């Protein structure tokens, strides 16, 4: 048996075990991390040589879900895992975002961390343990790393914080908060919550930070026993003479180029100055060094202006929002639409309503099987005025869409209140920063324009950070793209007037203090109120009527014991209803039936068929049915779908009938009255009493009738 090093802790009432040396022994570092019965294999491999031609940290984090982990066989034709699920992509981003700032920016050797979920107890989410596992392998390895970090999930139920809640506990929780932090600072926050007040959210972040300390202690213990000596950090310095020459050439001109509020004018001015600079110095210095020094001058100008003058290079105040505009109903035919503009950032959001059958089917390790609300974020190249390849959404697009989706879920009506599947598409048509929060604003308005009865409007804002010497800092409201690029933090907050619905915090520094967190959260609240006022002017309440082009949903209830009658053998009956009426039909286990149709006539037709299928035949009632079979002694008539009765030959007419065929033939529609339902549930019918209301029906025992030829069919003597 292979000997492994094992380390244990009890976290949140469940055992956490990190083991190294048993699997993936050829990787630079590898651990298995198990929490309760959820287990992951986390590996790190580093290239031996720097990657040529890159000016960034080449870190790749892959999060892979194995379906066997939950005892599943993958769907699809080939029955094996394919491209990562949306949840796997988000889990990979959850790991990448806090670790990247803690690795040296100068590192050019490719790093690959692969997180593989190899066991899932379907109770505990594996994502945060991917973060802890990745931090552990970096801590053990030779790679320079300013961790370790801990990652904790926090729920809030019945006035108490819950550490690492299960899927079942999260369903009852008011928040789903993930915090990643080092010993002293927070490096990543992600939250979805049901309008949580700002002060409570800050307390929850503090609670998670404290819980992370034990995970950091555990990794320090592992490093002490298994850690390798760290490699030196590469030095990538721009020669001093280049920096001096560039600074002298652009002195005073950088601020002038950056002063334009219009993004296009600003970029043109910056590029024009860059061209002059390169032309003037290219014969003396390397172009790469010139461009790097110029980039530092731009960064210095942006940051120093904010820190020293409390104003931005384009003249906007520290807490001043860009020009806002909101408009709804901008497109014909669609079910709902809106356009939200903030400066040069514009997002068009479209709402499409469908039946509950159109909910997304999830094939992964998450607790959910279906999703009735989807928000898809698209970022086209033209939104930044660039020429780029346009293809399927990448990790960034999926992450931004998930954030906006999470922000809106708390205000959505339940399926019982609004039995629709809702698809949102947020198309970014102009980008100068904070498009994800623009997507929240435009999508909120689009939902209301579509007539979705959302509880409240939701708005989002991004708060930036510029840090200086001696722990000085400045938080700035509504950051533009250039401030995001040269700043230290992107603190996104979405919510209503009554609280926070989503947070996502990414940063370039090695963590932020609780003073920064507090300032950012309350600064976002102030800005959110201003944005909501602008949105209210466009549309303050959801429309009371759906678009004429949206499907209508009609809800009825049937006896749960009759569900089988509606579905039919192998779904034959329900498929027939859908085809006949051009509707959608969704049936819940409690007998709730939702019919979706583009017009009321089709819906009512489907409703009638379903009601007839589930209706009990009553003695004395009159029905119009179709003759299905003819015997020598009478005719069988289907009076309700799947329910036949017999009209004896003596009850076919108000005169003597010699042959049944003289009065009716198969396919004829006749009106009959139920005269009797015998002890075996067989239905006796009379046409004679319809033709002659004064006639008295004859009670008869069908067992005394002549035996007919032909095979026995159960429906000949039953309700079915």
Swiss-Prot record:
One of its GO terms (biological process) is RNA processing. Residues 620-688 form the S1 motif domain. Residues 551-610 form the KH domain. One of its GO terms (molecular function) is magnesium ion binding. Transmembrane segments: none annotated. Coiled coil: none annotated. Keywords: Cytoplasm, Magnesium, Metal-binding, Nucleotidyltransferase, RNA-binding, Transferase. It is found in: Cytoplasm. It holds the Pfam family KH_1. It is an enzyme of class 2 (transferase). GO terms for cellular component: cytosol. Its EC number is 2.7.7.8. Mg(2+) binds at residues 484, 490. It catalyses: RNA(n+1) + phosphate = RNA(n) + a ribonucleoside 5'-diphosphate. PANTHER family: POLYRIBONUCLEOTIDE NUCLEOTIDYLTRANSFERASE, POLYRIBONUCLEOTIDE NUCLEOTIDYLTRANSFERASE 1, MITOCHONDRIAL. This is Polyribonucleotide nucleotidyltransferase. It comes from Dehalococcoides mccartyi (strain ATCC BAA-2266 / KCTC 15142 / 195) (Dehalococcoides ethenogenes (strain 195)).
